[in-house]
Amino acid sequence: MTVPGTFRKAVEAKDLSAITGSLDPGIEFHSPVMVKPYHGRDSVAALLGVLLEVFEDFHYTDELVSAGRPDAPAQALIFNARVMGKAVQGLDLLRFGDNGLVTGLTVMVRPLPAAMTLARAVGRT
């Protein structure tokens, strides 16, 4: 199984240890609700652990793999979930390094009221 497949399976299984293992030590995470990115495996894994708790009924609905730049592989995982009862649609954009680990993760969510609820929910944990 490829690392992209490993990351997806780990998220779907809510396996934080496996998620952490798929992250590069120097990963950069861009949150949909914070201006500054998070840096480093430990910080990003901690935040992803919170998201595993906050998202309800999380499931990926589609997967897109970049074919444009072999030197910078990327994958987009599209998901649906709920946060405090509000429906959320989102996208995890992953970038991979030469070692096959996730070096960049950008999460985008919509609609705005759900993104605001997500920010409140993450802030409570």
What is each PLM-predicted segment?
Residues 1-125:
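C-terminal and inter-domain tail/linker signature
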